[in-house]
Design a protein with these regions (language model features):
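Residue-level recognition of tetratricopeptide repeat
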Residues: 42, 90, 124, 156-159
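Structural marker of alpha-solenoid helical repeat scaffolds
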Residues: 86, 120, 151-154
């Protein structure tokens, strides 16, 4: 009886170890991206790197360090551009491409990215807000109001911020 218990215990332990080994190898294989010409970075890590740069740029912007902020926005743009090359159907990436360009003053190109994003997701909150902000910045208030109308059903932060900006102008 003791021998049987030891054998069962051994088999259970062996089974658990094999399972753990299998899962860790599977996770490792699933997580590796290989070399894709950008130091092995996939679209997700490029996107996350870009977002981190945007957050840093916003901090400099709040401190009125505009030139430093612009440099970071341009670095972020490069990350998002590489991510977009790998995923042309991602409205979030297009939103950030437009955002970073708008923040550096390239309104025309920013608008093209926002419009591409709206073709993928016409209700995208960020794109509608930021495109509305771009329209305000370029003196096209009526177009900004159209973006506000799209956001009106959500009663969200994006709606409130765009509404306030339009009212100020």
């Amino acid at each position: 009886m003791i021998n049987l218990k030891k054998n069962i215990k051994f088999l259970i332990t062996l089974f658990i170890l094999l399972e753990l080994s299998f899962h860790s190898n599977f996770v490792y294989a699933a997580g590796s991206s290989g070399d894709d010409g950008d130091g092995g970075k996939d679209k997700v890590s490029l996107y996350k790197s870009g977002k981190k740069l945007v957050l840093r740029a916003k901090k400099f912007e709040k401190k009125d360090k505009i030139e430093k902020a612009k440099k970071l926005y341009l670095k972020a743009y490069d990350k998002f551009e590489k991510a977009y090359a790998k995923d042309k159907k991602n409205a979030d990436i297009l939103n950030y491409l437009g955002y970073t360009l708008r923040k550096t003053g390239n309104f025309e190109k920013a608008e093209t990215y926002y419009l591409k994003g709206l073709k993928l997701d016409s209700g995208h909150l960020g794109i509608n807000e930021y495109l509305g902000e771009l329209y305000v910045q370029t003196g096209r208030i009526e177009l900004a109001k159209e973006r506000l109308e799209v956001l009106s059903g959500c009663k969200c932060e994006e709606y409130e911020e765009l509404k306030e900006l339009i009212e100020e102008n």
